[in-house]
Amino acid sequence: MNKKKDSLFKTIKKNNIINVITTESFSKKIIKLNKPDWIKIKIPVDTFRIREIKSALRKNNLHSVCEEANCPNLPECFNRGTATFMILGSRCTRNCPFCAVSHGKPNSLNVEEPNNLAKTIFDMGIDYVVITSVVRDDLYDGGAQHFVNCIKSIRKKNKVKIEILVPDFRGRVELILKIFNSGLPDVFNHNVENVPRLYKKVRPGADYKKSLFLLESFKKKYSNIPTKSGLMLGLGEKDTEIIQVMKDLYSNGVTLLTVGQYLQPSINHIPVQRYIPLSEFKNIKKEALSIGFTNAFCGPFVRSSYHASFQANKLIKKI
């Protein structure tokens, strides 16, 4: 290893901010470092509520993104009796290198899913629900009508606030907006995930500008509904790029923001390049609020649906 590479290695190891690196400078050699203390999760002693939620999901043939995506917040959220439901099956038609959700040929749509979802939400007695989905590029509408069917079924049985976290629908914005007109959510969420420079590596099946256009178009047509988006950090993005993405989101009508740390689900996924210190997350939140966001959740374990009700409820009440 030459002096330049050796110097970089020592800097990385000293700061202990990088978990795994796979770069040309290291000849694609994997270097593993311990996770910092702020990344470690405490498992609750009482797991009864967790088992109860999992049982309800299995009973009604439902999926949660909490389980499918190996979310680090599962113990906390399930213990509070909350879950983010994942519709349209458990197999994604894309294979993003950061995501733990299964991919491959998807199953046919479960027409009973909207009713099963509504019943489960009623049985759980929750007042705020987040619904997301796998990407279904095989469907003409990307699954938009199924989202609407779920929203309608839930509203028939429950007086709950509904947040949806949607895919990009392959850029078919005009069609999607028309479909959602018959069943609108309380919050519309679509994640840009990372900075545009890294899209080919991080989000190869997506287009940054199309994601912004989806968020902008939804807000223009349904101006009374808050729009939301999120970023995951630690993949090689620069501070200036993060700020620019936040400005892009805000200028396209987004008022709610989530920013979290990317955690590598397995050795087969894209490696973490940097663990973001807590102080940097605080600075990112400060910057987001100065840009104009109504609310910004920023921290290592923040995910799109993490404490979603706390973030959105004040804003929804104002509408």
Curated annotation (Swiss-Prot):
Cofactor: [4Fe-4S] cluster
Catalytic reactions of this protein: [[Fe-S] cluster scaffold protein carrying a second [4Fe-4S](2+) cluster] + N(6)-octanoyl-L-lysyl-[protein] + 2 oxidized [2Fe-2S]-[ferredoxin] + 2 S-adenosyl-L-methionine + 4 H(+) = [[Fe-S] cluster scaffold protein] + N(6)-[(R)-dihydrolipoyl]-L-lysyl-[protein] + 4 Fe(3+) + 2 hydrogen sulfide + 2 5'-deoxyadenosine + 2 L-methionine + 2 reduced [2Fe-2S]-[ferredoxin]
Residues involved in [4Fe-4S] cluster 1 binding: C66, C71, C77, S305
Record's keyword terms, sorted: 4Fe-4S, Cytoplasm, Iron, Iron-sulfur, Metal-binding, S-adenosyl-L-methionine, Transferase
Record pathway: Protein modification; protein lipoylation via endogenous pathway; protein N(6)-(lipoyl)lysine from octanoyl-[acyl-carrier-protein]: step 2/2
Binding site for [4Fe-4S] cluster 2: C92, C96, C99
Presence of the UniProt keyword Iron-sulfur in the record: yes
SMART domains in the cross-refs: Elp3 (SM00729)
All copies of domain Radical SAM core, residue ranges: 78-294
Primary localization class, coarse: cytoplasm
Superkingdom, taxonomy of origin: Bacteria
First-level EC class: transferase
GO cellular component, one term: cytoplasm
SUPFAM superfamilies, per database record: Radical SAM enzymes (SSF102114)
GO molecular function, one term: metal ion binding
EC annotation from Swiss-Prot or TrEMBL: 2.8.1.8
Cofactor descriptive note: Binds 2 [4Fe-4S] clusters per subunit. One cluster is coordinated with 3 cysteines and an exchangeable S-adenosyl-L-methionine.
InterPro entries cross-referenced by the UniProt entry: Aldolase_TIM, Elp3/MiaA/NifB-like_rSAM, LIAS_N, Lipoyl_synth, rSAM
Compartment(s): Cytoplasm
Entries under Pfam families matching the protein: LIAS_N, Radical_SAM
PANTHER family listed in its UniProt record: LIPOYL SYNTHASE (PTHR10949), LIPOYL SYNTHASE, MITOCHONDRIAL (PTHR10949:SF0)
UniProt similarity note: Belongs to the radical SAM superfamily. Lipoyl synthase family.
UniProt protein name: Lipoyl synthase
